[in-house]
Amino acid sequence: MKKVRHILGIIGIGVLALVLGLLIFAMLWTMDIWRHITFDEIVYHLFAPIKGTNPDVIWSFIFRALTPSLLIAAALVTLNIVLKKKANKQKLVKIINVAVSLVLVVSLGITTFCFCNKYDVVGYFQNIGESSDFIQDNYVDPNTVVLQAPGEQRNLIYIFLESMEATYSDKDSGGAYDDNYIPNLTNYALNEGCCFNGSTGKLNGALSLHGATFTSGAMVAQTAGLPAMEEVGNAAGTQDTFYPGATTIGDILAKEGYNQELLVGSDAVFGGRAQYFSGHGNYKIFDYVYAMENGYIPQGYKVWWGYEDEKLFDFAKQEILDLASKPEPFNFTMLTVDTHFEDGWVCDLCEDKYPGNQYANVISCSDKQVYEFVEWIKTQEFYENTTIVICGDHITMDSNFCEKIEPSYERKTFCVILNAVPAEPAEERYFSTFDPIS
């Protein structure tokens, strides 16, 4: 019996050290990796499917959170086993166990305080307990209004740009930097398309509000006008449909006979995107898994979150031409990924225009790729009857790229509509990523 208690005691102290260590290192890892996210995003991704997550993120957690926790627990267990074999070391074992446990508990308390303060965890739970009339006062259910289709149905190409901000332009154009990292996108917004900037001559963009500050939430916001709350993230991992009660752009266009497709360079299951788009408009899902299963990329090929944007744009051209060859109008939606935090993915097309600033180089490369893609679209016969929407999904979560921006500067996602009908409105609009559907 004494031996059993001895074994259980060693197991208990090991498990305690592992759990406390994991909590501490997980919070430290989160605060270092995700410096610019909100607690609702953390909760959302805790419940969303892990399938499709960038393996770099998983390995980072393993090395920086799980491994040190296991080492502490293993060291403490080993120490207990070795010292408890010696009769004169029993008191020392107890002192060590109490001391280590005390250090871990105090460290957990300090880390938890810093974590809660950084992510306003208390405010998050206070908000959960309060009701809000925001949706009731501002959301218009598409089912309650008369939507009249135009005489000639127009094609829609909706390009979600990962973490793309109007912020990345130069100060003279309405951005926050001395350099313009997105000259082509800036030109589209100020000289060719509509960014709802009125007569300001400056870039205008969309605010990222609660429930739309991460990719899945942002895509739901822009296509449904609703926030993707954490309980929806939970449902996305267990249900065949995502937000079943919502009416989205996909639902509306499906009723009008549109062929629809979603193209992403990652696993569309991640964040519930596959469920959402297939359940709202019966989109064809062309993602990383589809590309591999159908020979677009070699078996086992994987960079970044799946495959890089250089391939994404090539696949987009093929898919759009296929859609355009059919008699029905089409809605082609795509999402880039190279500009995802941390620091983005440097592909073969990227130039070292900004030495020592990888993220700036990746953003500049994305700007160039989008430009070449849009210019290709303009040369196609279907373009005259096609509207292009280019929007950042949310502001970047990169840990340091925007650190030196003036606190008074209001960061917004990039947004422009090309070849719009009717023409650009004269008035300036102050809008969020919930508004494009309107």
Give the location of each predicted region:
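Short linear sequence motifs
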Residues: N117-K118, N127, S132, Y276
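Short extracytoplasmic/periplasmic juxtamembrane "stem" segments immediately C-terminal to an N-terminal membrane anchor
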Residues: H45-L46, F125-P142
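Solvent-exposed soluble domains appended to multi-pass membrane proteins
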Residues: D141-S438
